[in-house]
């Protein structure tokens, strides 16, 4: 059964339910979710993902890979910018079947932004980092024109890059509006979700690697920021918040933990209901480290988190999670029409369906 149809029915069934952020339907009424793997023809690790609709989605990753489907995943075309086989496209933001903006990560000039307006047949390099200390991790857009990219700290503060023309041109925003970073603090370019947006002007960025795992918030499209601690594991370069998801300017989820396979990740998820001012640990967290998270378009209290160790779902706004799949994925995202995808190592791409 198509996921967007089934979840529409579930959403309608909850109209008369109590309006509580932690409300979830009875367990017997919950859909059983499953991933349907699709053949991509690549072996790259796909950490960038941007579904547009039931038919159109983009994904990106290592070896300069940029994939595009226009038939709901039945076929994928590899449409990378030429001469980029050595780059890692860890994030991609697509607007439609023809237009997308991709971020390659790395130190110095490896951090670049490319834009296509013809479905990947041609690309324009619109930004190349010339600061050797900068390392860009993630990219996010508020709308078709306004977007941000974030770099690990330079001179003690996270660096923010901004565009006002859909990624055609970029400028570094003044550092004065950004709080000071902690020693060792950085972002994780693991899922394209260390920087996210909601509500037209709000942005959040996630950090780790320091004594506290933190989330920064901007209400003015990246010009000024505040910061809050989270209960997600910290205190080591391998620990922190890896992925964020906000369904509106108030309700958000954070996932992470310790990415090393031999380490435990208790409290791997947290939830906020005040826009990131405060964060609370999930009462029943995911079963391990998770790098990606997304709200399901409907019902509003449902979300999915993924990582190398499996996938989890919450039906109560992030308070409790339960595992529904043991396969490895790095990131997960949904289109507005309800179609959801996950991607990861060895070219893995899957569509979320009812079992």
Residue ranges, per PLM feature:
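Positively charged n-region of N-terminal signal peptides that target proteins for export
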Residues: 1-5
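Residue-level hotspots at or immediately adjacent to binding/recognition sites across diverse folds
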Residues: 21-355
